[in-house]
């Protein structure tokens, strides 16, 4: 299962997600580097996001970005999904996929049913000497 962070996130850190993400999406499949259009085509459910839905913190020497718990879509857009589900954080204004991570429940989604998103953590770690 693929995970992804956009080059802008890698260059600017987790605050870039906090500042620019305006949608969290449950998608039915993801392959590393999938385009914004491909991610939207795999959309099962979505929730609007704002900078206040993210919390930046320090964990030891690392920086973490935690998403708010309790985000939901009252009515799933489509049916589908399985063990290959992912959660994508996108910037709809700039048409960018900012961050993609695995959705681990593996539950199928039925169109029209509610979908609850878990709280997730993006971690930016200190470099280590080789």
Label each PLM-derived region with a short phrase:
Residues 1-85, 92-130:
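Small cysteine-rich, disulfide-bonded extracellular modules of the LU/uPAR three-finger superfamily
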